[in-house]
Amino acid sequence: MQTYGNPDTTYGWWAGNSGVANRSGKFIAAHVAHAGLIVFWAGAFTLFELSRFDPSVPMGHQPLIVLPHLATLGIGFDANGVAMGDTKPVLAIAIVHLVSSMVLAAGGLLHSLLLPGNLEDSDIARARKFNIEWDNPDKLTFILGHHLLFLGFAVIAFVEWARVHGIYDPAIGAVRQVEYELNLAKIWNHQTDFLTIDSLEEVMGGHAFLAFVEITGGAWHIATKQVGEFTKFKGKGLLSAEAVLSWSLAGIGWMAIIAAFWSAANTTVYPVEYFGEPLELKFSISPYWIDTVDLPDGEFTSRAWLANVHYYFGSVSYTHLTLPTIYSV
């Protein structure tokens, strides 16, 4: 879809990111606005689920996605999936997300309408450092490094929340503080048996290790330059907007597929009280999961929604790994 080296190329409204691939300012505007849509969905869907929540029915047997995750964080609900006293904490989280989405939307409009369409034209030297050059690995890894730093800090926030506030432990049926166990041998071994992990300490230990890797990797990408000439042997000519997009989508898709298998089977990270009973794996044209508990016709557990939606969305994202990359070379 992207045509490089042709200054006369025009794009229709349907072309998406192709219209901003070589205009870093507009590229940022699109990404900030997209982030605003995601955050708006989180806030709006929290309110939507809260309005439909029925305390007389187990939370895991209702078509909910957002509320069970808040419950596992020890916010708003008890061990039976019943609202604790009032729902003000859940309501506050929804409102914060909605307000944040408006801030992000304003940022998207700011970058789109008022700031330079290309960061290379910015009067601010620091902004010019983030100008995108798709076949320049130094530029791309510099930007990647900052992404990794933010991801690492977000993981630290989650680990600290579990340590200070606490998260829900289905083994005792209550919210408790969880100290991470940074055992590298266990973390390495859980690459193959993570579906059955039953220790929150080890789960948080894996997150703590992930935060270290992301922050260290982010600092490395920001601080270092390519060693020697960037030759074809090292990948010169392979980097492009389509290639980076396809690899990114493939990475997201792979994570979604892993999350599907994990959420379908694991009852420590995804407690039965909030997500419903473990699922049964079936095969047709593709894998899918069905509930193992009797529910009224047309109704499914939170776990069934979570696993199947993650798998099919992940599969669609993963298919972008091939053709866009091939046609961009």
List each language-model region with its residue ranges.
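Soluble secreted/lumenal catalytic domains
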Residues: 21, 27-29, 35-38, 43-47, ...
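Conserved small/polar residues in nucleotide/adenosyl-binding loops
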Residues: 319-325
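Hydrophobic alpha-helical transmembrane bundles of multi-pass membrane proteins
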Residues: 33-34, 38-39, 49-55, 84-101, ...
